[in-house]
């Protein structure tokens, strides 16, 4: 396959991947966007009907009031509307009214009268002066059977006397959503075609310039008198001019051939690199392979970025000679670090036991939270699935010792003396390699706080990490 075709294929794949990501975001936003717009309409409708329903509710017999009569007539009234190509042939609103205790007094579907709806989110929140809404599955086995309800209070002056809730099936919005998704897909296909045409033109221009430069380089290698080609690109033109200048300066010397060969070789090396990169994409891998390759790139990029940020943070920390100590609530600290790692704990089904401790410790809050978080991260990494981690604090008259106990395999004897060294890390069960800076950061924080950090194996299995700090300012 020619290099021009490889470049075109590589460009097209890059554009296709980018378009796929953008398209996925657009399509993903269609459904919630339509539902948010519908929710706005529902709250307007509910507010209007709540005003109309007030006399019926005050009369004491809303099932025979004007609102009930209107809905009864509506059910027998045929209508048809064409909304942008979508035919609407029936009313899809479901309306019910409750009293101030949440008991249903009127139901347009005649199914829930007399039932207690005070626990439904729309009624419960509205009765408490808040915005009430909910989305409920009519059929638990059918995820498309959900109905969106929005409620409004029925007021008699400043007194709340009931709630009116308006519901609409989400399935009624499906035609609009599907049509929008189809239009986005068509527009994306057209955009992709335009990008392909533009890419073909760009690749043709680049390929022509590279071919001219290659012919010129070959001629210079053979010591043939050839004019400097017009390459269009300023970078390639400067490169050709440099090559021409070198050829002129070395002309007539015995080693001209050696220099030109070396220069030509250096010129062909980046071309070979471009060719090699294009060959990786020439087979046109399926989207899932492209996605996996992209995910790998993003993962490695994130890892490098995290390493750089950790290095910078470590360097800043090591350059600090003093810190501003404040009273840190240990219970709140435990809560923050544990909540921040809920996902990691859930992924490995690890049980985290947090021992309540009402005590303060003298530290800089951000640094202490990062240090304790590093100890907890380390425990999560080395604790097997369905294991257990205990977060506790031991208090004496002068010190508070924060402890993280896991049920992992422990630290090998050969690593105990090096565990706090920078860039030293042990292999994880998942095969991932850490930066080796987490425990070094904890050690440096302990130094700044005039404290002490230790890690030791426990007899029952696992590792106990202890961060000993002062209770009071020193």
Swiss-Prot record:
SMART domains in UniProt: HAMP, HATPase_c, HisKA
Modified residues (Phosphohistidine): 265
Cytoplasmic side: 28-146, 205-474
Residue intervals of the HAMP domain: 205-255
Keyword annotations from UniProtKB, A to Z: ATP-binding, Cell inner membrane, Cell membrane, Kinase, Membrane, Nucleotide-binding, Phosphoprotein, Transferase, Transmembrane, Transmembrane helix, Two-component regulatory system
Recorded catalytic activity of this chain's protein: ATP + protein L-histidine = ADP + protein N-phospho-L-histidine
GO molecular function: ATP binding; phosphorelay sensor kinase activity
Membrane topology: Multi-pass membrane protein
EC number: 2.7.13.3
GO biological process, any: glycolytic fermentation
InterPro entries (alphabetical): HAMP_dom (IPR003660), HATPase_C_sf (IPR036890), His_kinase_dom (IPR005467), HisK_dim/P_dom (IPR003661), HisK_dim/P_sf (IPR036097), Sensor-like_sf (IPR029151), Sig_transdc_His_kin-like_C (IPR004358), TCS_sensor_his_kinase (IPR050428)
Any one Gene Ontology cellular component term annotated for this protein: plasma membrane
Transmembrane segments annotated in the record for this chain: 7-27, 147-167, 184-204
Periplasmic side stretches: 1-6, 168-183
PROSITE patterns: HAMP (PS50885), HIS_KIN (PS50109)
Occurrences of domain Histidine kinase (ranges): 262-473
PTM text: Autophosphorylated.
Localization in the cell: Cell inner membrane
Main location (coarse class): membrane
Task of the protein: Member of the two-component regulatory system CreC/CreB involved in catabolic regulation. CreC may function as a membrane-associated protein kinase that phosphorylates CreB in response to environmental signals. CreC can also phosphorylate PhoB.
Family annotation (NCBIfam families): PRK11100.1
The name this protein goes by in its record: Sensor protein CreC
Species of origin: Escherichia coli (strain K12)
Gene from which the chain derives: creC
């Amino acid at each position: 396959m020619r290099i021009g075709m490889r470049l075109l294929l590589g460009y097209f794949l890059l554009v296709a991947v980018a378009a796929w990501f953008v398209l996925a975001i657009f399509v993903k936003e269609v459904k919630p966007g339509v539902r948010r717009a519908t929710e706005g309409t529902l709250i307007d409708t509910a507010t209007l009907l709540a005003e109309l329903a007030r006399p019926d509710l005050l009369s004491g017999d809303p099932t025979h009031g004007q609102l009930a009569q209107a809905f009864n007539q509506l059910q027998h009234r045929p209508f048809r509307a064409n909304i942008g190509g979508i035919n609407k042939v029936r009313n899809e609103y479901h309306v019910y009214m409750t009293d101030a205790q949440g008991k249903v007094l009127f139901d347009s579907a005649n199914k829930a009268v007399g039932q207690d709806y005070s626990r439904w989110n729309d009624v419960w929140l509205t009765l408490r002066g808040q915005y009430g809404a909910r989305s409920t599955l009519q059929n638990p086995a059918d995820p498309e059977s959900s109905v969106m309800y929005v409620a409004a209070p029925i007021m008699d002056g400043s007194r709340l006397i009931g709630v009116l809730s308006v519901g609409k099936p989400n399935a009624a919005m499906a035609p609009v959503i599907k049509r929008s998704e189809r239009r986005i897909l068509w527009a994306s296909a057209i955009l992709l075609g335009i990008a392909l045409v533009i890419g073909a033109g760009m690749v043709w221009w680049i390929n022509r310039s590279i071919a001219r430069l290659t012919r010129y380089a070959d001629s210079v290698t053979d010591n043939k008198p050839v004019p400097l080609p017009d390459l269009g690109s300023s970078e390639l033109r400067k490169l050709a001019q440099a090559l021409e200048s070198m050829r002129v300066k070395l002309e007539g010397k015995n080693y001209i051939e050696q220099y030109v060969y070396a220069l030509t070789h250096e010129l062909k090396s980046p071309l070979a690199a471009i060719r090699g990169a294009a060959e990786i994409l020439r087979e046109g891998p399926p989207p899932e392979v492209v996605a996996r390759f992209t995910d790998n790139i993003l993962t490695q990029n994130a890892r490098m970025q995290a390493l750089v940020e950790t290095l910078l943070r470590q360097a800043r920390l090591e350059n600090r000679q003093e810190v501003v100590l404040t009273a840190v609530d240990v219970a709140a600290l435990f809560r923050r670090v544990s909540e921040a790692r809920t996902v990691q704990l859930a992924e490995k089904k690890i049980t985290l036991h947090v021992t309540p401790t009402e005590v303060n410790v003298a530290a800089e809050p951000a640094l202490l939270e990062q240090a304790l978080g590093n100890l907890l991260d380390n425990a999560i990494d080395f604790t097997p699935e369905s294991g257990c981690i205990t977060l506790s604090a031991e208090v004496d008259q002068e010190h508070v010792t924060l402890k993280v106990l896991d049920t992992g395999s422990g630290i090998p004897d050969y690593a105990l003396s090096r565990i706090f060294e920078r860039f030293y890390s042990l292999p994880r069960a998942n095969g991932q390699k850490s930066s080796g800076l987490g425990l070094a950061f904890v050690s440096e924080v302990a130094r700044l706080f005039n404290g002490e950090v230790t890690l030791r194996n426990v007899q029952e299995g696992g590792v106990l990490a202890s961060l000993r700090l002062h209770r009071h300012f020193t």
